[in-house]
Amino acid sequence: MNAPVRVAVTGAAGQIGYSLLFRIASGEMLGQNQPVILQLLDLPQAQNAVKGVMMELEDCAFPLLAGMVATDDPNVAFKDADICLLVGARPRSKGMERADLLEANGAIFTVQGKAIAENAKEDVKVLVVGNPANTNAYIARKAAEKVGRTNPANYTAMLRLDHNRALSQLAAKTGKAVASIENMAVWGNHSPTMYADYRFATVNGESVKSMINDEAWNRDVFLPTVGKRGAAIIEARGLSSAASAANAAIDHIRDWVLGTNGKWVTMGIPSDGSYGIPEGVTYGFPVTCKDGKYEIVQGLEIDEFSRACMNKTLAELEEERQGVAHLLG
């Protein structure tokens, strides 16, 4: 058995946390030979609820669960953490302006980024799930950079939910098994502006674009369906997507840590300037993962429609970035 990995989870008492923690403890995220210690962060008023979740985790008698800590102090939660899942964020309440949402989350993620950089392992892997995920990841990274120690490239945002949503829509359209679809890409922000791009996707070497061969479906059905899926779930369920978000977080970390065997996945990462995306913007790119590192898939042709979509989602990210600039000093 390997030495335990410390996994910090924020918003541990929330809906996504509840769907996430049991799957981490069961070994779904890091494999069946990897014990974990869960370090659970939530607000002071949520500590009782966290204790209830911990009681349930105990009652599962997971062989891989080597320990648990509950706290409302980020410095304790992130102490020696190998992986940080930043799930907790301020949700948008009725009548709340986007600027207010950015402001509220800016404060949270500035504190957490600093605490991670001061307390976690130097090679810590950070995934921001809480929305607006790309900009929250950007804020955490910027706060962490002031401290140093940790690797800025390891502050990532979750676009895997958009990626998985796109795969399931393509599977339904083509009648192919979802697991057989490869080379899917999602570009940009985790928001309705994201660009799900199946121009390179294949099933057993056959082009998905050729199978579907319908630009109007792509533009008028596929992209809006994937982009607005979160809103459709809230409309139907009365609550935001929690289990599917938790599932995407598991996928994101598992692939990053254990590798993708050459398969493409989507991660929101600090741009290195690839595909004309300005350096430092947290942007969704197709990547492959190996030996605990990700690499952007290079050399893809960007046509006119794709460039327009990529620029639109970039413009939104730039606007969000300007909206939080004053918080970063």
Curated annotation (Swiss-Prot):
Coiled-coil intervals, chain numbering: none
Keyword annotations of the record: NAD, Oxidoreductase, Tricarboxylic acid cycle
Source species, domain of life: Bacteria
EC numbers: 1.1.1.37
Family matches, as CDD domains: MDH_chloroplast-like (cd01338)
Stored InterPro entries: L-lactate/malate_DH, Lactate/malate_DH_C, Lactate/malate_DH_N, Lactate_DH/Glyco_Ohase_4_C, Malate_DH_type2, NAD(P)-bd_dom_sf
Record field: catalytic activity: (S)-malate + NAD(+) = oxaloacetate + NADH + H(+)
Residues reported to bind NAD(+): 11-17, 105, 112, 129-131
An MF annotation (GO) of this entry: L-malate dehydrogenase (NAD+) activity
Record's keyword annotation contains Iron: no
Binding site for substrate: 92, 98, 131, 165
Gene Ontology terms describing biological process: malate metabolic process; tricarboxylic acid cycle
One Pfam entry name: Ldh_1_C
Catalytic residues (UniProt): 190
Top enzyme category: oxidoreductase
Protein's job: Catalyzes the reversible oxidation of malate to oxaloacetate.
Family according to the record: Belongs to the LDH/MDH superfamily. MDH type 2 family.
Name the UniProt record assigns to this protein: Malate dehydrogenase
Gene: mdh
